A protein has these predicted regions:
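Short N-terminal segments immediately surrounding and downstream of signal-peptide cleavage
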Residues: 12-28
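Sequence-pattern detector for short linear motifs
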Residues: 22, 48-51
């Protein structure tokens, strides 16, 4: 019995450590801002919106407090924002995704020690409303990529940061969102999907699934002739 308890305790500690590492990667630092300014200023407007890696770089950029204030003051009673076209049916640049990006921005500022909104009751209320609308409405894009990769990837980061504040109902909603991602595909899509599964595993405190997701990602770090890393070290998708 003592051995079993020790194993469970060690597993819980490992899950906590992984979650802390994720949080450190998600939250911006002053060093991040310096390097991101140099990188992002060199990109064209088209590049800034068309490449997922660039989108993720912008998500690491420190949030503008003035823009955040606008998000707080313009949110509707239902938890939406009037400038987002929630009826959009485009397969690329799907507008409802902006709702998820705003949730992440709000959660980042709420979770950053030293920010003017750190653990702000006003901010927390807005986040709960935004999450509640998404969980209740369950928006679906005609493009599978947003449903299985884009939205879970953005919201997954928010879920991990906001986990201590989530209600049981919100946790169930978060896991449902993350369950849209399953192991499969090849190349970068395979890595993104496995990364989303890993986040779900952390929310479920499922160490076995964490290891499966880790191994799925690691399996793609090889050279080959199909999608992924090529013999000349280029990457094809």
């Amino acid at each position: 019995m003592a051995v079993a308890c020790t194993c469970v305790s060690a597993q819980d500690a490992e899950l906590t450590r992984i979650k802390q590492n994720f949080s450190q990667l998600i939250l911006p630092t002053e060093t991040d801002e310096f390097h991101l300014n140099a990188t992002l200023s060199s990109l064209s407007r088209t590049e800034r919106g068309s490449d997922q890696v660039v989108v993720e770089l912008f998500q690491r950029y420190p949030s503008d407090p003035d823009i955040i204030r606008t998000f707080l003051t313009t949110q509707t009673a239902e938890g939406t924002w009037p400038d987002i076209n929630y009826q959009d049916k485009k397969r690329s640049g799907w507008e409802p995704r902006i709702h998820t990006e705003r949730i992440l921005e709000l959660v980042k500022l709420y979770s950053t020690p030293g920010s003017s909104y750190y653990h702000s009751a006003e901010m927390e209320k807005v986040i709960h409303k935004a999450l509640g609308w998404w969980f209740a409405t369950k928006p679906v894009c005609l493009n599978w990529w947003y449903n299985q990769i884009g939205v879970p990837k953005t919201l997954g980061n928010a879920f991990l940061l906001f986990e201590p504040q989530m209600t049981d109902e919100e946790r169930r909603g978060a896991i449902e969102v993350m369950e849209h991602a399953r192991f499969g595909m090849t190349g970068q899509n395979k890595v993104w999907l496995a990364g989303n599964v890993l986040v779900r595993a952390l929310l479920q405190n499922d160490m076995d699934l964490v290891r499966q997701a880790r191994d799925s990602i690691a399996s793609e770090i090889v050279t080959g002739q199909a999608e992924g890393i090529q013999p000349d070290w280029s990457f094809h998708q």
